[in-house]
Amino acid sequence: MGPEEVMVQASSPGLISATEVLVAAATFCLLLLLTQTRRQHAPKGLRSPPGPRGLPMLGSVLELRKDPHLVLTRLSRKYGDVMEVTIGSRPVVVLSGLETIKQALVRQAEDFMGRPDLYSFRHITDGQSLTFSTDTGEMWKARRKLAQNALKNFSIAASPTASSSCLLEEHVSTEASYLVTKFLQLMEEKQSFDPYRYMVVSVANVICAICFGKRYDHDDQELLSVVNVVDEFVDVTAAGNPADFIPLLRYLPSRNMDSFLDFNKRFMKLLQTAVEEHYQTFDKNNIRDVTDSLIEQCVEKKAEANGATQIPNEKIINLVNDIFGAGFDTVTTALSWSLMYLVTYPHMQKKIQAELDQTIGRERRPRLSDRGMLPYTEAFILEMFRHSSFMPFTIPHSTTRDTVLNGYYIPKDRCVFINQWQVNHDEKLWKDPQAFNPERFLNAEGTEVNKVDAEKVMTFGLGKRRCIGENIGKWEVFLFLSTLLQQLEFSIQDGKKADMTPIYGLSMKHKRCEHFQVKKRFSMKSSN
């Protein structure tokens, strides 16, 4: 056979097609066999969780492409609070129902406190993140507690100014005052504006002040670079990473994954610069911020016998990364959704402002100690968290050992999704859950928030993996919102409408709105 004949035969569509079919069929059979082999059968007397069968190799991935929180909520009505779906080649247990989730994350916390070994998680701070790490041992617990304490201590530490009771109040007050001035300036210049761009920088400034003891000018390129890369992270992860569930995709080009890796590299470089500056100027007699506090632990604890509380130098950057993340995107998104609800329901805005005027007046700014005296404001914030459910799922969990939940056998290392959206819209818990109604959280007199109902709202997870920035985040949202509403009235341009349709992602955003307007309510007479 001559060279030309070989080339003609090799390029024959019929032969190539037959070869491809045979290879595809063999691959299909092999992967199907592997998938079936990987599925662990329940021990005698126990059942595996029910769920949809899905397609070979793809599982339910096609069903879950759009609004997976809604799809999984719908499936839970058919299969129950403990069900199993297959995403790609990975079996995933999905938990719904508040009591079932509490049973798993609180009462059986040790069983469900793991993180799955997802491909994307390995690239966040080189797999050493407290939040995303698969580690659950004593060292992880000690470092998590240390980070939690550092964040709390430098938020509630006494403020040097008389107008604020703690550093968090001082930082938020500074940023909220800037926003009031900026929003009024934008009204004069443009007659309408998008508040998100300015709020995100102010929230970043608060967490920078807590972590690095530094407030940046809003046009500072260093601060803007932090904001931009965090925004990119949210955009990239919003699409999800299919390679987490279909391993074959790890070896194929992916623009999303390239962007994800690039973000992690740039963000770590920014944090590394800040931490190195703190090392160079560290003074154990003058602990300035969270980073100094962590360095102090690293320096002072080296001589102690308990190695679990020691932090290697390189781990400090990872802890700062976790603390920064805990106080940034959630607060920004909560404030953004709050403003959308306020302009959509202006009568609720007026009720909050009446409460602020009556309780605080116009002589001073709101403080954290005012929260208990502002029940309607607190109820509005709770309803914003519940109704928007902008964190539809927690970060995925995994089982640390073989366990049983509600009579269903769940093997070790099983990926677990927690459907927070389902809990927040469960008709068994909430009357008319699709309605936005802050009064649902108030007693009959409207004078107190019902704490039992408040604790049913899921935003920050539960149990041993609960977000370390939960309390700080709630405090920030309260202080920003009450300070802005004390001084400004928000509205939408005539003829325009705020689009409240959620856009699915790591945290669900709404479409950006450029039609906000503000009006000054009064001039602040005093800052005391």
UniProtKB/Swiss-Prot annotation:
One of its GO terms (molecular function) is arachidonate epoxygenase activity. The keyword Chaperone does not apply. Its cofactor is heme. It is found in: Endoplasmic reticulum membrane; Microsome membrane. One of its GO terms (biological process) is xenobiotic metabolic process. Gene3D superfamilies: Cytochrome P450. Keywords: Endoplasmic reticulum, Heme, Iron, Membrane, Metal-binding, Microsome, Monooxygenase, Oxidoreductase. GO terms for cellular component: endoplasmic reticulum membrane; intracellular membrane-bounded organelle. It is an enzyme of class 1 (oxidoreductase). PANTHER family: CYTOCHROME P450 1A, STEROID 17-ALPHA-HYDROXYLASE/17,20 LYASE. This is Cytochrome P450 1A5. It comes from Gallus gallus (Chicken). The lineage of its organism: Eukaryota, Metazoa, Chordata, Craniata, Vertebrata.
